[in-house]
Amino acid sequence: MSRIRDVVRKKGGSSHCRTTDEPTGKSLETLVRHYIKICRSRLNSELEYFEKNPSFSEALEKASMAINEKGKRFDHQRRLTSVSLEGSKVRLSKVINSLKTCKNFAELHDLLEKLLHDVHGIGELYCYDTALRLGAFLGIYPELVYLHRGTRDGARALGLNWKEDTLDPKIFPPPIQELSPHEIEDFLCIYKKHLK
């Protein structure tokens, strides 16, 4: 069984999901069930794609350029310029050994933010998504919920401290705690308007 499926079995999976299949009802339980039924598999597929790359170099090339399994740019990075993505790729390629020896997701994420903070157009969502994709290859996943623009809106709607960089998954309402930290990030981003 693949590593991502092991993570899904233990903690749940995740997915970047745009769906026209709207949830019926707005209770947290209903929204979480909708996420699990409709959206979870999409990020699982994305992460499995990165997990199965033949080498870290290839995973880094695809992750830094935000290229999906169809050879297209991921939706979250669709507005980034090729110059920004290329600048990120060049910078990350120079420290490939440091990246692939990160022991946990936080270390990988922090290294990406440190390396890319001054690359024009590259922000916290790109750093998170790239760390998640590279982390899938390395078998390391977030233990905390990382906040960026979309997820901050969801955290704020739940009355949580949306000004933090990360939140402990244990502070979320019980239905949301059924999800893994990277699923919670995805859930907040997808359902932020339903949480208001």
Question: Residue ranges of each PLM-predicted region?
Answer:
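Extended, charge-biased low-complexity segments
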Residues: 54-77
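C-terminal accessory module of base-excision DNA glycosylases/AP lyases that mediates lesion recognition
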Residues: 1-53, 108-109, 125-196
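Generic detector of intrinsically disordered, low-complexity, polar/charged segments
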Residues: 9-10, 22, 68, 84, ...
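Generic structural signal for hydrophobic core residues of well-folded globular domains
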Residues: 66-71, 115, 119, 134-135, ...
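Helix-hairpin-helix/helix-loop-helix acidic hairpins
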Residues: 74-120
